[in-house]
Amino acid sequence: MIAVNNVSLRFADRKLFEDVNIKFTPGNCYGLIGANGAGKSTFLKVLSGEIEPQTGDVHMSPGERLAVLKQNHFEYEEYEVLKVVIMGHKRLYEVMQEKDAIYMKPDFSDEDGIRAAELEGEFAELNGWEAESEAAILLKGLGISEDLHTKKMADLGGSEKVKVLLAQALFGKPDVLLLDEPTNHLDLQAIQWLEEFLINFENTVIVVSHDRHFLNKVCTHIADLDFNKIQIYVGNYDFWYESSQLALKLSQEANKKKEEQIKQLQEFVARFSANASKSKQATSRKKLLEKITLDDIKPSSRRYPYVNFTPEREIGNDVLRVEGLTKTIDGVKVLDNVSFIMNREDKIAFTGRNELAVTTLFKIISGEMEADSGTFKWGVTTSQAYFPKDNSEYFEGSDLNLVDWLRQYSPHDQSESFLRGFLGRMLFSGEEVHKKANVLSGGEKVRCMLSKAMLSGANILILDEPTNHLDLESITALNNGLISFKGAMLFTSHDHQFVQTIANRIIEITPNGIVDKQMSYDEFLENADVQKKLTELYAE
């Protein structure tokens, strides 16, 4: 267990937390959420002792061990992969080092023998004999092949280093586990493995993540950082979001009898619980949900941008025909004879292990890049809005304020008040609209690019990782806006829930062909024939 008592912290004149009092108990996984900049990562550093609060303290039960997912990917460059994982249990690694140093001595004294015996006893108590096999199991689960286990960290790629550091945090069954964005840079298989690991983990987990599917899968509770306080709610992220919306609705219907409000809450909980999986964690979470009262749900103060793409005209039957597109970049063939026909109601999610392949395809069909061979043709009734993964060219060197920046992309001569109102709905309020475009944060740039796409009135959206840099509120708003979109879409995203709730067709691009299926993302992942075909294509 980890208890937070009267913790307050401020940086300069900015207050992050004030008199926070909460407990995180064993057997539960807490999703720590809050707007960008609210202080989620800072709070994890307070819990780990890396940052000292101005008032209050953090208390752990005596003898308990805390593990943290390290963020510095270059910290262990000269160490072997397997050893880096075992370093996750600091005391065990110290014992191993001291023990090995004694046995390496050429003149082994009686004192050395006594000390070695003490260390051997402690080594056995700490499950030292299983350390290497446990580390290897964690690495294998995350997709690090055995031939890399004895390599130095410096020899690994960026995403491989992330996996090793994650294995380090998970190693040795820590009593409290702190994970800051653990799914970043992980492939789908590694995320699924991590989900199962955390679902079966018996101690305390506190996780920060922008991945709603992940939060829904692993969390028993949500810790909401808002107004410098942290409030803990039972349930996963979707339950927190839906219940906060219900609480807002009930607060606006204050004249309704309490009995009616209680009935609405009970119906909501029953409906939500009915969709839960049968896992041990989901079952225990369901029992907690059934005890919820009206006082346990509260409206959120979160602000959600207003995302609404309205096509100016309907699409005809001819949408897009792609035939034999091939492209080589820096000597590597990223697209090889890609062909497909897009229909008017398609919302196609593009997947694949090589992200550059999807980005290249989107650039070609948007007219930003030439193919080496092959053709594509848009239907005469179509108009496209392209959202690139790298948007830097739209902002770098721009001295325009946000109103003038947006005006240059407006197809109609819109008034200042219209553009200010539009930006306001995307959470740029008051004086923020006078910000220079070249000083925006990553999330602000994405909201500007989405505003540009909405103003276009396009009936085809081409979106390359539109959820990057967005907070959970903006991702949720964009997700809902695209579900309602009446046009057609080609898009890619690492956000599982985003893809699952929007796409009705999946195209995976492999080096040896595509797999194109009219089905949802989860069906695509669970379809044995599809997965067999993909395995064959990647193996060729």
UniProtKB/Swiss-Prot annotation:
Record GO terms (molecular function): ATP binding; ATP hydrolysis activity
Keywords: ATP-binding, Nucleotide-binding, Repeat, Transport
UniProt xrefs under SUPFAM superfamilies: P-loop containing nucleoside triphosphate hydrolases
Segments forming domain ABC transporter: 2-252, 320-537
UniProt binding sites for ATP: 34-41
Pfam family, one: ABC_tran_Xtn
Name this polypeptide is given: Uncharacterized ABC transporter ATP-binding protein YkpA
